[in-house]
Amino acid sequence: MAASMDEDITANPPPSSEEDPLAEERLGFVREVGAQAVWSLSSCKPGFGVERLRDNIMDTYWQSDGQLPHLVNIQFHKRTNISQIYIYTDYKLDESYTPSRISIRSGTNFNDLQELQVMDLTEPTGWVQIPIKDGNVKSIRTFMLQIAVISNHQNGRDTHMRQIRIHAPVEGKHYPLELFGKFGTVDFQKFATIR
């Protein structure tokens, strides 16, 4: 993993161009790998834990219970390619509980996390896409991700996050042999069929 990028990004997507992480999944460009990880939180109110972040219901949410920063830890059993993180928030419903500044960190464990980027959110409603990059590479390979809520809107203390999805690029696309045409020599033609 290269040195941290420390880049600030501001996200305020207009409602008409709302991101949809499921669209890319349905097209087969990415796959959701959050189910392959162990999730933990820095704190939560009873009944508003990590299961609410992963239930695919936009009306439920994780609610923290403690001092900032609030942390979502995502640990994979093996090094995993990650290309994007999607976070669903709703400023209209959550107001001061809505994150306004988040940090994305990556590493092999809690002791060597490096900040990849910091993102400012301005009254976000809907899916917020966070591209995960390491320099010019469009994805990273990591054992652990950490999403840290650094501050909330209106100086709120606790935070609400409604959903989180973790995307990995689809590897090993298979192409039909017809794209390559017919073999022209006898040496290659003997490999054209399987007995």
Swiss-Prot record:
SMART domains xrefs: APC10
Family note: Belongs to the APC10 family.
Spans annotated as Disordered: 1-21
DOC domain sequence ranges: 9-193
Keyword list, A-Z: Cell cycle, Cell division, Mitosis, Ubl conjugation pathway
Keyword Cell division found: yes
Pfam families attached to this UniProt entry: ANAPC10
Protein's job: Component of the anaphase promoting complex/cyclosome (APC/C), a cell cycle-regulated ubiquitin ligase that controls progression through mitosis and the G1 phase of the cell cycle.
SUPFAM superfamilies linked to this entry: Galactose-binding domain-like
Subunit structure: The APC is composed of at least 11 subunits.
The name this protein goes by in its record: Anaphase-promoting complex subunit 10
Organism field: Drosophila melanogaster
Keyword Transcription regulation annotated: no
